[in-house]
Amino acid sequence: EAPLVPQEELQSITQSLLASGADIVEMNTIRKRLSAVKGGRFAQHCAPAKVFSIVLSDIIGDPLDMIASGPAYPDSSTCADARRIAEQYGLRLSPEASQCLERETPKVLDNVETLITGSVRELCAAASAACRELGYEPVLLTDSLDCEAREAGAFLAAVARAHQDTERSLAFLAGGETVVHLTGSGLGGRNQELALSAAAGIAGLEDTAVFSLGSDGTDGPTDAAGGFVDGGTKERLARQGVRIFEVLKNNDAYHALAACGGLLHTGATGTNVNDVAVLLIRR
């Protein structure tokens, strides 16, 4: 990375966007303009030399100009897009950062070849194969999950309740990347929040569980990759005086899941191809 603004300001802008619920495309539209190499500028610096780019996609739909902020791909976003995002989320920018948003990125690059070697589709396929090996019939709900984390959890809980009469063991999978609009001061991540939201909806259901995790082994500013809950999670937390909806309001899923043994720890995986959430119904 070669930021055009002080590292502290870049981190502050990124944290502000995260806290406001900005999605990865919006974040990268801003970040590529604050970098000397992102937004196609790396390939521009290399010209006329040829650049061969091998890409792991962590963005739904594999937009090459947005993955890792597109250092070796023409940028489809504009200065007007960046200004709109900055205004929408009320970003506080220094004069230097504001000037960066007005510098257009390369729109044409003829010295680049690109190969995508992995994405959320491969993640979902691998997860489906693992579920099948464990005796579950996999059902892919979507590989483009893109909504509020707690809404995704509530949706998986609704799917669970709708399939309680099944005679087969089922695994419903959803790949993608949810967002969290922070309303509290707790600790957690989007996968932990998704799982805890699902716990409220599957409460009391036997042989039913939900887990959600980030493929990079990190979920939010925590040491966990995600969370795991089952039909008894809500009751176990209630016995400790923990109310799920109060926890979600404070965005404190980490501590709630820690209290009931529901945190998933994988360590750094060395890759990043979005997240996967899985609903398991065992028969």
What are these regions (language model features)?
Residues S35, A43-A49, D58-I59, D65-I67, ...:
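Solvent-exposed alpha-helices and their adjacent loops that cap or buttress functional pockets
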Residues L4-I24, E137-V139, G201, E235-A238, ...:
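Alpha/propeptide regions of enzymes that mature by internal proteolysis
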Residues L196-R283:
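Internal helix-turn-beta structural module
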Residues A49-F52, P74-F155, Q164:
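Accessory alpha-helical/coil subdomains and C-terminal extensions
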Residues I24-T29, L56, I67, D75, ...:
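General beta-strand structural signal in soluble alpha/beta enzymes
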Residues E1-L10, G184-N191:
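Short Gly/Thr/Asp-enriched flexible loops that form oxyanion-binding sites at enzyme active sites
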Residues P3-P95, L101:
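Internal gly/pro-rich beta-alpha loop/helix module
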Residues G135-S212, G220-P221:
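Active-site segments that bind and position negatively charged phosphate/pyrophosphate groups
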